[in-house]
Amino acid sequence: MLNNAMSVVILAAGKGTRMYSDLPKVLHTLAGKAMVQHVIDAANELGAAHVHLVYGHGGDLLKQALKDDNLNWVLQAEQLGTGHAMQQAAPFFADDEDILMLYGDVPLISVETLQRLRDAKPQGGIGLLTVKLDDPTGYGRITRENGKVTGIVEHKDATDEQRQIQEINTGILIANGADMKRWLAKLTNNNAQGEYYITDIIALAYQEGREIVAVHPQRLSEVEGVNNRLQLSRLERVYQSEQAEKLLLAGVMLRDPARFDLRGTLTHGRDVEIDTNVIIEGNVTLGHRVKIGTGCVIKNSVIGDDCEISPYTVVEDANLAAACTIGPFARLRPGAELLEGAHVGNFVEMKKARLGKGTKAGHLTYLGDAEIGDNVNIGAGTITCNYDGANKFKTIIGDDVFVGSDTQLVAPVTVGKGATIAAGTTVTRNVGENALAISRVPQTQKEGWRRPVKKK
């Protein structure tokens, strides 16, 4: 159906005392992203014209963390209830738009559920998101007459009879801007909490003869709020379970779905295999037939077809062409690039370095600020000495070079095509094509030499 223009209000002023943290509650992360950012993303995906963020505690930290240009920051200096929070945002409401109210500590609300709520809102009425609970203790109850919603009674204000009601308010609702402003102006704090409840607008709307339509979410987890770290950890597992299920159904082989974490987005080809305790962060692309071993962390990287990443490898902001092999215990830092068939072995670290086709760095090596050609062998213990204490310099190695073990390349330096660097060499000057570079001190031998003995 055709919807009116819509703005979203996100309530995020709470301190989160039960988190026992200096960080505002809504900035605690779920799947690597602040809870409130999940809600902001949902609002933007819905096409919100404006997103009004009502904040209080930790405002400076919130503003540092949230860079969304679409946010309108609304201060709630005193936390006097949800109705009071909405009153702070009301001056920004247009009369002819719908206002959707969300919460920064309810991170798993889905765009699909919110769109259904938006579609269900009657003309001049209210769309209300509700759920039924076996144990509704502590929640506001939905009151009805002849099946029609008439109001919401908070638990502390409810009668014994009303406390038997299982349908509860989630706090998420949508109404017209002009109506919302009028109802907000009529709120009082005449209740057990001495606060201004947004829920009172339901009774006000009913008294005006307006229709209130209740909609249920697809999953209960969508409307679960977070007040402590235990609740946050439970929602984290719910989210991760849902992501793992989607990947499995899409053809990704997760060896143990309960031991996989997705903290971003994963684009994948066919026949991808992911072992246990793997973490995917940011935007990651895995080609066809990629295999990732246990304990790996992959962040903001592209992994080509037929690559194999062995256990306990960290790959960040890197780009791997087809048929590369990495690890175990390797680290590819930002700017690492491997061309087809390249190999990086155990305890090798790369940063701003490029390995050519078929090039191998087998073990115990640091390659930083380097451009390395095709079919190069990098011996164990090789180090590109790229930093002089003030500036970084580049090492260039041509095709078909053999670099012996325990070599230090003091940048800036260039090694020509086909050259050989003898083991134990410190390269301080350019090496020509097909040349042998060696800088070892001549070996001497002292016959009958005795090691020092400790004095007793």
Swiss-Prot record:
Q: How is the cofactor bound?
A: Binds 1 Mg(2+) ion per subunit.
Q: Which GO terms describe its molecular function?
A: glucosamine-1-phosphate N-acetyltransferase activity; magnesium ion binding; UDP-N-acetylglucosamine diphosphorylase activity
Q: Where do the segments described as Pyrophosphorylase lie? A: 1-229
User: Where along the chain is UDP-N-acetyl-alpha-D-glucosamine bound?
Assistant: 11-14, 25, 76, 81-82, 103-105, 140, 154, 169, 227, 333, 351, 366, 377
**Keywords noted in UniProt:** Acyltransferase, Cell shape, Cell wall biogenesis/degradation, Cytoplasm, Magnesium, Metal-binding, Multifunctional enzyme, Nucleotidyltransferase, Peptidoglycan synthesis, Repeat, Transferase
State where Mg(2+) binds: 105, 227
Q: Does the keyword Cytoplasm apply?
A: yes
Which pathway is recorded for this entry?
Nucleotide-sugar biosynthesis; UDP-N-acetyl-alpha-D-glucosamine biosynthesis; N-acetyl-alpha-D-glucosamine 1-phosphate from alpha-D-glucosamine 6-phosphate (route II): step 2/2; Nucleotide-sugar biosynthesis; UDP-N-acetyl-alpha-D-glucosamine biosynthesis; UDP-N-acetyl-alpha-D-glucosamine from N-acetyl-alpha-D-glucosamine 1-phosphate: step 1/1; Bacterial outer membrane biogenesis; LPS lipid A biosynthesis
Q: Where are the stretches annotated Linker?
A: 230-250
Q: What is this protein called?
A: Bifunctional protein GlmU
The catalytic activity, as recorded, is:
alpha-D-glucosamine 1-phosphate + acetyl-CoA = N-acetyl-alpha-D-glucosamine 1-phosphate + CoA + H(+); N-acetyl-alpha-D-glucosamine 1-phosphate + UTP + H(+) = UDP-N-acetyl-alpha-D-glucosamine + diphosphate
Write the Enzyme Commission number(s) for this entry: 2.7.7.23, 2.3.1.157
Q: Name one Pfam family in it.
A: NTP_transf_3
The active-site annotation reads 363
The cellular location(s) given in this protein's UniProt record come to: Cytoplasm
The Gene Ontology biological process annotation of the record reads: cell morphogenesis; cell wall organization; lipid A biosynthetic process; peptidoglycan biosynthetic process; regulation of cell shape; UDP-N-acetylglucosamine biosynthetic process
Q: Which InterPro entries match?
A: Bifunctional_GlmU, GlmU-like, GlmU_C_LbH, Hexapep, Hexapep_transf_CS, MobA-like_NTP_Trfase, Nucleotide-diphossugar_trans, Trimer_LpxA-like_sf
Its required cofactor(s), as named, are:
Mg(2+)
- What's the family? In the N-terminal section; belongs to the N-acetylglucosamine-1-phosphate uridyltransferase family.
Query: CDD domains attached here?
Result: GT2_GlmU_N_bac (cd02540), LbH_GlmU_C (cd03353)
